Amino acid sequence: GLLSNGVFHVGKLGERIVVGTYGGGMSLLDPKTQQWETYNIPEGLGDAFVYDVLKAKNGDVWIATWSGVNRVRGGDLKDRSKWELHTVGSTQGGLPNDWVYGLAEGRNGEVWLATEGGLAQFNNGKWQNWNHAKGLGAPYERVKDHIQYKNDPSKVSQHHAKQKQEMGLEKVDVAYNPNYIVSLAVDAQGIVWAGTWGGGLSRFDGKAWTQYTVTEGLPGNHVFMLHLDPKGLLWVGTNNGLAKMKDGKFEILTTQDGLFNNAVFSMTTARDGTLWVGSFGGVARIKRS
């Protein structure tokens, strides 16, 4: 079964349930036979920490890890020769950071990647990337009065300390990194949405960036989750509540509206329109009228 009880990702890969774990690689469950199949570093995974899994329209399977991103050509997981690992080094910096947190496919088959160092795109064998200097994430001066998390990760992590130094943020002693994309989504119009660590929500139309923060109506500037419902509406899970975006404005839901906790990490919409919202400590089921 699972090689780790820490779970980052649960989704579908064909008819099977795919689980990305914390230190235990990627596991797949066949619901009919109840048989598990596990893939880890010996099978080709870049890392045992798996944050997201995407099956592209062309059949390729992409796996986001903390040591780069795997691409399995044609989705043939059992054929080791089909496995590729793309890292900062192998892409000559096309992938801006090896810590990959999210994957999404665009309208034309391009693959978008959320990393701890910015946004990347893989299209027809070519890489592009965007970071805070190019428009990703709101500047510190715009969000500094609304940073709820005061503990600075760089004080306990050399990895985060190095990132802050590279960005020139040594004097910022709170949880803020606009290059760190925690959540990612691409809507039906091809707009890319990126949720950042303290820099709010960013919108990218392929040419220009727009930032949304507490000032524009978000409940919080740490954006942990992005969900597009069947109607195409964008839901934004933050450190301080859940927001529904419609016509450029945000409708906020908090514990007062039924959420278990205001820190929202996951969400899905059931067939009947019911919302299932995963938050710190529990899950809320919200029936929409």
Residue ranges and their predicted role:
Residues 1-289:
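Carboxylate-rich, polar loop motifs that coordinate divalent cations or form catalytic acidic clusters
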